[in-house]
Amino acid sequence: MLPGLALVLLAAWTARALEVPTDGNAGLLAEPQVAMFCGKLNMHMNVQNGKWESDPSGTKTCIGTKEGILQYCQEVYPELQITNVVEANQPVTIQNWCKRSRKQCKTHTHIVIPYRCLVGEFVSDALLVPDKCKFLHQERMDVCETHLHWHTVAKETCSEKSTNLHDYGMLLPCGIDKFRGVEFVCCPLAEESDNIDSADAEEDDSDVWWGGADTDYADGSEDKVVEVAEEEEVADVEEEEAEDDEDDEDGDEVEEEAEEPYEEATERTTSIATTTTTTTESVEEVVREVCSEQAETGPCRAMISRWYFDVTEGKCAPFFYGGCGGNRNNFDTEEYCMAVCGSVMSQSLLKTTQEHLPQDPVKLPTTAASTPDAVDKYLETPGDENEHAHFQKAKERLEAKHRERMSQVMREWEEAERQAKNLPKADKKAVIQHFQEKVESLEQEAANERQQLVETHMARVEAMLNDRRRLALENYITALQAVPPRPRHVFNMLKKYVRAEQKDRQHTLKHFEHVRMVDPKKAAQIRSQVMTHLRVIYERMNQSLSLLYNVPAVAEEIQDEVDELLQKEQNYSDDVLANMISEPRISYGNDALMPSLTETKTTVELLPVNGEFSLDDLQPWHPFGVDSVPANTENEVEPVDARPAADRGLTTRPGSGLTNIKTEEISEVKMDAEFRHDSGYEVHHQKLVFFAEDVGSNKGAIIGLMVGGVVIATVIVITLVMLKKKQYTSIHHGVVEVDAAVTPEERHLSKMQQNGYENPTYKFFEQMQN
């Protein structure tokens, strides 16, 4: 009777799975789906052409609740009767993700797990049951769990029967993305492998193998999408931060929420693995067999970063997992991999490799990123107002990790040398060479991590400075356009804008200094870009100051305060130059967000070439000439143009530092730096600050200074010429031609003169003349 009942149940479930909804969804080309990637606009499937499209409103991103996902499905598919959502079984690859307020979408590719938008009354999925496979199902009316929970139940059930999970679907919905049961197909191990190899890797019936231990994910369904998204974000975070001027603020909270479950899961799986590997001999045999397998990507085409234990190296190494299939030598983190395989495999390695060098239990340098608790946590988290504090913590963690690893290697080196005392000389050399290479690798890896850390930090600081400068300039222009304008408010906004530009200039110089120290070739390549950026800052400030001419009353009232403000900036630049000369640079990554400005040690010198670019060309004009500017009664302020003066045809009054400056006349501007002993290099700074000077009122003093300078220069030149002439003597150490017709006495005299002989009579008369 039981076999007959089983056949009846199977037929009933199959008939239910083959039912077709009656709401008109059968005529759609593709199933309604939505996909999210924090920091990017949401994507949805076009049911007419089967292609992924960006959010139609251009504003929705990264919805954190299932209710919000259901509402979003109803918004993007208003013509369909969306009643529920369920997480898809397979991750998908989607291109052309867009950012907010961006007209053009970049061709970045991300692998995410979408949500299916269920239309009409719920109908279970139709599951194909291959030969020798079994169709199973479980229902619990007292349980209402998520898709991920039931996926884990199905997989564990198949594992208990020594089979693989082939396909599965949800049963009996009890809420939004919550169900009371699951239907699934289990196939024998050999049959499942054959079916997967023969099937298309991108079809929906391929098995999603989540890797690692069978951890309980019942409470972490929302975090799974975020973790998969984080793995893909690591691949392009540097490029995103270098190209974009805006920060991904939407992803902060979601990533922070994902960190705690991730750490808890890691600790839990590590403790379970440690206990398992020390229980019985049979368990150790199983673990040894698992850790001896080669890494398998699997038939799917995803790019998920995972770790496997390399028996030949005696350590865990990274590889890319395709998303399905593969074997059990597949771990989420390096710590979990070493916890499972490290202790068990160490005994086997000692037995089989006694003639070789001892294996290193310390993680050897790899091209992959550091552990999540070191640099990755900083790199994966978008920048915010506490960027400098986060950077300092990441830098300290990086240095502490490097010191710990170096200390461990040194201790092992000492132990190896003690054990190698009785070994042949060749073996001793091999031990020394082995550890020398390891130390060099650790140093190189630390240098690469520092470089990556600093470059990411610099890019984030640059984006923040751009936002601050833009906001300060907008507030300054708004204050000038107010009716009536308030001089005090205008001055405060101008002061904030000047400080923002000063921060931008300081950051540019700091970045050039760091690049020059770590990569002189790259510094030579970006030299022209740095110069162009400094020129743009200079001209942008002059234009902003010139906007006061459009409001003469305000300009006249705050003239003294602005003069004092610009004079303070001049004094600050002098202090920067003095500190830079006296204090060597001993750390990396100092930036414009540091609280103390007295720690600044860097400036840049812009040197003229061939006399085509003089110091006077960089002197800004006095921004106040109210009498020479017509009154502006409408308080209209033109927007600031950041182009060079020659390109926009900027006109200035006589005496202006920008008068007659043309970009084609400036053939080249060199930024030269010299290394001085152990203190690194010093780059001197031509003062790119903006002073309010009244050139016309000091013409007499300037002429007097010029005349005095000419007189002093003349005296110095004459003194140098006389001193140089006095040094000339009749001593000659070169070859003197000797005439063959001279007498032997004259020839002998010539030889004596070549050897330094001087006629006392001649020397006496020379001294008398002098």
UniProtKB/Swiss-Prot annotation:
Annotated Gene3D superfamilies = Amyloid precursor protein, E2 domain, Amyloidogenic glycoprotein, amyloid-beta peptide, Amyloidogenic glycoprotein, copper-binding domain, Amyloidogenic glycoprotein, heparin-binding domain, Pancreatic trypsin inhibitor Kunitz domain, Pleckstrin-homology domain (PH domain)/Phosphotyrosine-binding domain (PTB)
One of the GO BP terms on file = endocytosis
State the protein's purpose: Functions as a cell surface receptor and performs physiological functions on the surface of neurons relevant to neurite growth, neuronal adhesion and axonogenesis. Interaction between APP molecules on neighboring cells promotes synaptogenesis. Involved in cell mobility and transcription regulation through protein-protein interactions. Can promote transcription activation through binding to APBB1-KAT5 and inhibit Notch signaling through interaction with Numb. Couples to apoptosis-inducing pathways such as those mediated by G(o) and JIP. Inhibits G(o)-alpha ATPase activity. Amyloid-beta peptides are lipophilic metal chelators with metal-reducing activity. Binds transient metals such as copper, zinc and iron.
Give the protein family.
Belongs to the APP family.
Q: Which organism is it from?
A: Sus scrofa
Where is region (Heparin-binding) located? 391-423, 491-522
Q: Which residues lie on this side of the membrane: Cytoplasmic?
A: 723-770
Annotated site residues (Required for Cu(2+) reduction) in this chain: 170
Q: Where does Zn(2+) 1 bind?
A: 183, 186-187
Q: Where is this region: GFLD subdomain?
A: 28-123
* Keywords (A to Z) from UniProt: Amyloid, Apoptosis, Cell adhesion, Cell membrane, Cell projection, Coated pit, Copper, Cytoplasm, Cytoplasmic vesicle, Disulfide bond, Endocytosis, Endoplasmic reticulum, Endosome, Glycoprotein, Golgi apparatus, Heparin-binding, Iron, Isopeptide bond, Membrane, Metal-binding, Notch signaling pathway, Nucleus, Phosphoprotein, Protease inhibitor, Secreted, Serine protease inhibitor, Signal, Sulfation, Transmembrane, Transmembrane helix, Ubl conjugation, Zinc
Annotated region Disordered: where?
Answer: 196-284
Q: Which domain of life is it from?
A: Eukaryota
Q: Which residues carry this modification: Sulfotyrosine?
A: 217, 262, 336
Report the residues modified as Phosphotyrosine.
497, 757
Question: Is Phosphoprotein included in the keywords of this UniProt record?
Answer: yes
Q: Give the location of motif OX-2 in residue numbers.
A: 344-365
Residue numbers spanned by region Collagen-binding: 523-540
According to the record, the residues making up region (Interaction with PSEN1) are 695-722
Positions binding Zn(2+) 2 in this chain are: 677, 681, 684-685
Q: How is it modified after translation?
A: Proteolytically processed under normal cellular conditions. Cleavage either by alpha-secretase, beta-secretase or theta-secretase leads to generation and extracellular release of soluble APP peptides, S-APP-alpha and S-APP-beta, and the retention of corresponding membrane-anchored C-terminal fragments, C80, C83 and C99. Subsequent processing of C80 and C83 by gamma-secretase yields P3 peptides. This is the major secretory pathway and is non-amyloidogenic.
Give the protein's recorded name: Amyloid-beta precursor protein
Where are the glycosylation sites?
542, 571
